[in-house]
Amino acid sequence: MQKTYPLLSQINSPDDLRLLPKDKLQPLCDELRAYLLESVSQTSGHLASGLGVVELTVALHYVYQTPFDQLIWDVGHQAYPHKILTGRRDQMHTIRQKDGLHPFPWREESPFDVLSVGHSSTSISAGLGIAVAAEKENAGRKTVCVIGDGAITAGMAFEAINHAGSIHTDMLVILNDNEMSISENVGALNNHLARLFTGSLYGTLREGGKKLLSGIPSIKEFVRKTEEHVKGFVSPVGTMFETLGFNYIGPIDGHDIEELISTLKNMRNMSGPQFLHIKTKKGKGYTPAEQDPIGFHGVPKFDHTSGKLPQTKSVPTYSNIFGDWLCEMAERDPKIIGITPAMREGSGMVEFSKRFPQQYFDVAIAEQHAVTFGAGLAIAGYKPVVAIYSSFLQRAYDQLIHDVAIQNLPVIFAIDRAGIVGADGQTHQGAFDLSFMRCVPNMTIMCPSDENEMRQMLYTAYTMNSPVAVRYPRGNAQGVELQPMQALEIGKGKVLKQGEKVAILNFGALLNEAKQVAETHNYTLVDMRFAKPLDEALIAELADRHELLVTLEENALQGGAGSAVNEYLQHIGKIKPLLMLGIPDFFIPQATQAESYADLGLDAKGIEQKILSMK
């Protein structure tokens, strides 16, 4: 490694980084970018975001005394360079793997990871709490939050900015704006103004002038407006953050290491809430990622010398099946509306967005708004379909109850990534949606076992006049033939195999695992289809005819489908041995989906062993 990366091989902590002379920092950035590309291409992971913040990461650790100073990364997709510089360089080949490095900043992994993250827009709220604590303790530590131009659109981020500005706490928020490339002329002007507005002389005059002119409101107001006009001339968005109580600087070139260091050194000594706006290019330094930052956001293993990502498998994903269904329905009904909170690609809605732009809404990272926006459309007689990941629906729970379910509005929730998701770990597992939706009145919840059933359930939801959730897993579908769509009978399961002694009640896409066990031991196998309402008559019949009932689901056992079956059996007074298989009471770490199923006993082998242990 020393031969290929002579500078990076010397950096085992930010302390080593701070020993480098400034003229070595850009060569270090070049090595860091090359190493990041090499390691991610060999292991899979998030690439384009990290490539875009190499200079920023180096500058932050060079200027700030991390981990004494607190550095917080929002979401964490961009934190790979941070991990490399903070003692985890030689472990990068394990990232997102079982027992390897966590895919996001993780408190248990390193003292440099101040906040465990994975979902967006949390950094400023947590950073403000940390900054307030530092002030109360007179610790002298600084707090820096790095947030992207996508994450800052969320309401939570602006709630935190509004609060921070109102209490005037010392902290720095850095907006990593990678939406468009930097204009050379505007970038140069902004770099100059950044040095001016963050310089010690300007800071002294600014604060001193406020005191001197405090008794002369008209002059004080003139000076304030003049300063804002100069800043607004370059970046009108700056006046918004100034209005919220922040001292806004920027935008500046986020790939100019010298300018970043100069600006950050000045800002480190400024008091009150500071806002630095930097412009970066996602995928910087790797042409394929620069040209296709969305495609190279999260990548599988690939040949970085060719820049070609491997072709997807022939079997479509559940997300693709959903997108195709949405297009098919939009051809029939102009009142069907597709809604996504900034997950167009992940939710399979690219084709729909192109073919039906008037029926497609990307509301940005705003899950709460997405749900209530759908409620409004439903009130007006439209058929809204909210396509959302299970773990992100958690952020809109009040809206699901207050704005949709209480009013019994026909909003369809297409819940992607339900169950075990794999390499993204604890923050992204879809483990809780059955539990938190099942207790909500007026909700209908369906759990398809394959893509054909998924289509039938989505169509069934379309025909209903009440809120409906269809939950389906991450990854490739089963490859079954798609049948013409028809509405299912609500709350009715389907006996797939009649056996004896043991009945397996399957909820969702683990059906094939259950089928292997049922065929080996001649057990009864049931595709329950509906988690709410349950097929109560079928459950009672199965309880009468079998010695053991087994429920199988990709959801937390507490409050899930198995709990629903148990509650019903208790309600009718049938005391029957019941084995509930699902996700236990802990957060599931990163691994492949297959590894997690095996660890949790949700593959065929684990299901079989648990059933046999009950007999």
Swiss-Prot record:
Catalytic activity entry: D-glyceraldehyde 3-phosphate + pyruvate + H(+) = 1-deoxy-D-xylulose 5-phosphate + CO2
Binding site for thiamine diphosphate: 77, 118-120, 150-151, 178, 286, 367
GO BP annotations listed: 1-deoxy-D-xylulose 5-phosphate biosynthetic process; isopentenyl diphosphate biosynthetic process, methylerythritol 4-phosphate pathway; terpenoid biosynthetic process; thiamine biosynthetic process
Matching SMART domains: Transket_pyr
Cross-referenced Gene3D superfamilies: 3.40.50.920, 3.40.50.970
GO CC annotations, alphabetized: cytosol
HAMAP family named among the record's database cross-references: DXP_synth
Role of this protein: Catalyzes the acyloin condensation reaction between C atoms 2 and 3 of pyruvate and glyceraldehyde 3-phosphate to yield 1-deoxy-D-xylulose-5-phosphate (DXP).
Name assigned to this protein: 1-deoxy-D-xylulose-5-phosphate synthase
Organism for this UniProt entry: Glaesserella parasuis serovar 5 (strain SH0165) (Haemophilus parasuis)
Lineage: Bacteria, Pseudomonadati, Pseudomonadota, Gammaproteobacteria, Pasteurellales
